[in-house]
Every structure is written in structure tokens, then in C-alpha cells.
Design a protein with these regions (language model features):
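Carbohydrate-binding surfaces of carbohydrate-active enzymes
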Residues: 1-135
Length: 135
């Protein structure tokens, strides 16, 4: 869905997001720019409960810039997990860094990144969190 960020942008583009969530087997949100859009997450979480869905997904880390470090990844994932996100979808993993992609942001979570081999620390944290967190 587009423009799910605020209630006013939803009204202009969708009418409302809640009815749309009913059609999804796994409702989801899109959290770009590292913003904390609590209303969007709470709406989706409410739809998950109302429609008896198994979880909620979120596309995250998009447009966060190249200096978005592990702390940012953990902080952004933690608040979303607290609001019911059970499936995290990384915004980008580039197959190549040729052309304009080398200036793309966020930094790709793929083998080109120097910290790629350390990234399982973040993913393991969220795997444990989702195992312990009630659905």
C-alpha cells in the first residue's frame, strides 16, 4: 500500500488502511527512512488481532543512509518487534555494486559489505526475540 505513514496520508490515498489489511494473509507495513511511525504499526497490529492472522511483517532499513549502523538496525527492529512485527523484510540486497547502485542507500546487507559476516548477530537477536515473544 502507498502512503500508509500517517492517518491523513492514508485518507488521501487509500481511504483507510484497516480494510486493506483484511485481504492479506500476513499484513505488513513499510518503514522507510528509519522513522518511528507508531500509528502505522499499531493499526497493522490491530488488524492482525482482529482478523486472526499469524503475524505481521515489516519492510525496514530502506532509505536510511550509508551510516546506519548495527545500533540503528537493532533499535529500529526492537521497537517494531515490541509492536508485533514477526517478520522483518530487509529493504535491499544488491547483487552488484556497479553504476548508481554503489551510491544507493542503505548499505546492502550482502557480501559486498565489510560487516556482512557479523550481521548474524543482529538476525539471531531477532530470531530469539520472535521465539520468546507471544504471537
Amino acid at each position: 500500500m502507498m502512503a500508509e505513514d500517517t492517518l491523513s496520508s492514508q485518507t488521501k490515498s487509500l481511504g483507510e488502511a484497516m480494510r486493506s489489511y483484511r485481504a492479506f494473509q500476513l499484513p505488513g507495513i513499510d518503514m522507510l527512512l528509519g522513522w518511528h511511525m507508531y500509528t502505522t504499526a499499531k493499526q497493522c497490529q490491530s488488524a492482525v488481532h482482529q482478523y486472526g492472522r499469524e503475524g505481521m511483517m515489516s519492510e525496514l532499513y530502506g532509505v536510511t543512509d550509508l551510516d546506519f549502523d548495527f545500533r540503528g538496525h537493532k533499535r529500529h527492529g526492537d521497537w517494531q518487534a515490541a509492536l508485533g512485527v514477526t517478520l522483518r523484510v530487509h529493504s535491499v540486497s544488491l547483487m552488484s555494486l556497479s553504476g548508481d547502485r554503489k551510491r544507493d542507500y542503505p548499505a546492502s546487507i550482502f557480501y559486498q559489505s565489510p560487516w556482512y559476516k557479523e550481521y548474524p548477530y543482529i538476525e539471531n537477536h531477532f530470531a530469539r526475540l520472535n521465539t520468546a515473544h507471544p504471537r
